[in-house]
């Protein structure tokens, strides 16, 4: 609350509602671990006692979207799995934030093929990207601090309740704007469709044309 609060010499602080609530929310984040591949091992290390994520109030991993407000997507994501992740994201209450952990979650990484989504920002509004393959637990701590800074400086609980800004955060889907949120474009395949000819067409084709002498 530094910079926005101050003592008046009588033993109490004067501050704004936004500043106080954002300070409390930033120090009590409840991560939702979405471990999809090898980056999840490093996320387990981040949650262990060595790195002491309890200093930031985020030591309690929540495996229920109803109790979480921070999703950490760790690993590459297939098109089939993206629908399940989007449903879990929609079940999380506002306000909520998202971290794309690792190169695969951020850009698809080395899995540049038809079955892998090239970055989870195709169906989720990502707030912080973490590079690396896999990233170290220290990088996850740094991303968590970036989320805390974003909450303190950018989120406004007054605007959220008055104007509903949190619900305006639509998924980034530039090529699929006319689709239901979370529904991705299926890989395009070249198919050849053969249609059976009609009976009249078959009869005409079987009748030889007269040849002039």
Curated annotation (Swiss-Prot):
[4Fe-4S] cluster binds at residues 38-39, 104, 133. It is a peripheral membrane protein. Gene3D superfamilies: 3.40.50.12280. Binds 1 [4Fe-4S] cluster. It is an enzyme of class 7 (translocase). InterPro entries: NADH_UbQ_OxRdtase-like_20kDa, NADH_UQ_OxRdtase_20Kd_su. Residues 197-206 have a biased composition (Acidic residues). HAMAP family: NDH1_NuoB. Belongs to the complex I 20 kDa subunit family. This is NADH-quinone oxidoreductase subunit B. It comes from Salinibacter ruber (strain DSM 13855 / M31).
């Amino acid at each position: 609350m530094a910079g926005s609060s101050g003592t008046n010499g009588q033993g109490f602080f004067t501050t704004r509602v936004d500043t106080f609530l954002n300070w409390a929310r930033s120090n009590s984040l409840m991560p939702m671990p979405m471990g999809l591949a090898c980056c999840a091992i490093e996320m387990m290390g981040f949650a262990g006692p060595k790195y002491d994520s309890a200093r930031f109030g985020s030591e309690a991993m929540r495996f229920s979207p109803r109790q979480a407000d921070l999703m950490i997507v760790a690993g590459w994501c297939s098109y089939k799995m993206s629908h399940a992740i989007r449903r879990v994201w929609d079940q999380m209450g506002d306000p909520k934030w998202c971290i794309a952990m690792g190169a695969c979650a951020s850009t698809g990484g080395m899995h540049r093929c038809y079955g892998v989504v090239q970055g989870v920002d195709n169906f989720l509004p990502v707030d912080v990207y973490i590079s690396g393959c896999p990233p170290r637990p220290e990088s996850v701590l740094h991303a968590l601090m970036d989320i805390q800074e974003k909450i303190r400086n950018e989120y406004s609980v007054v605007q959220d309740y008055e104007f509903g800004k949190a619900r305006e955060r639509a998924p980034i889907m530039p090529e699929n704007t006319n689709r239901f949120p979370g529904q991705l474009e299926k890989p395009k395949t070249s198919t050849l469709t053969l249609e059976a000819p009609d009976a009249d067409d078959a009869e005409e084709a079987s009748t030889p044309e007269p040849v002039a002498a």
